[in-house]
Amino acid sequence: NCGNGACATRKVKTFRVGNPVDWLPLLILGVATAAFGKQFPPWLYMWVLALALFLGCKWLCFRIELARGTNAGVGRKLGFLFGWIGMDAAAFFAKANPTEKPRAMEFTCAATTILVGSVLLWIVTKHVLTINPLLAGWTGMVGLIFVMHFGLFHLLSLAWRAAGVRATPLMRAPLLSRSLAEFWGERWNTAFNRLAATFLFRPL
């Protein structure tokens, strides 16, 4: 920072990957789920494990922004931790652009997607099950993705954006991808992409 003819450096906090405090929730939740979750039915064990990993990773992303010195208020922080599915804390805590407010058509599309997914999940799957159990499993999975990832999670993104928060949609129209890299890197499951870019990938 420079002013009055003099310059000074400002120490910026950095996120330490090796800090045990930052990784402790993920470790505890993961170990506890692996140790005690197998007594649950397989489908419930899967959901509990997914929730444990999600909460642990959410905490790591939250800690990064705390270390960088975010100016977000308590309400915004709690909203990111417990009211949003994404992992991009920097965008969530930043000031939103008024032009990013969602359009009414986006709400309609999300609601329609939930309806289509519900039909696949609770009606079509039952009929397909009598013909081919494997196909029924895939049909149910597609229906669930429509209901959750393209439907409910997108509605949640729209609600936050309507409130002036930069909540990037989890699915960003993946069918519009012009390349495989764009599909996986920018449009499909942006929460996972943020995790991979932050903790796995490193610039060459």
Language model: regions and residue ranges:
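Non-catalytic, membrane-anchoring transmembrane segments at the edges
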Residues: 1-2, 7-149
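Membrane-interfacial catalytic/cofactor-binding modules of polytopic membrane enzymes
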Residues: 150, 157-204
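N-proximal short alpha-helices
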Residues: 25, 29, 132, 153-157, ...
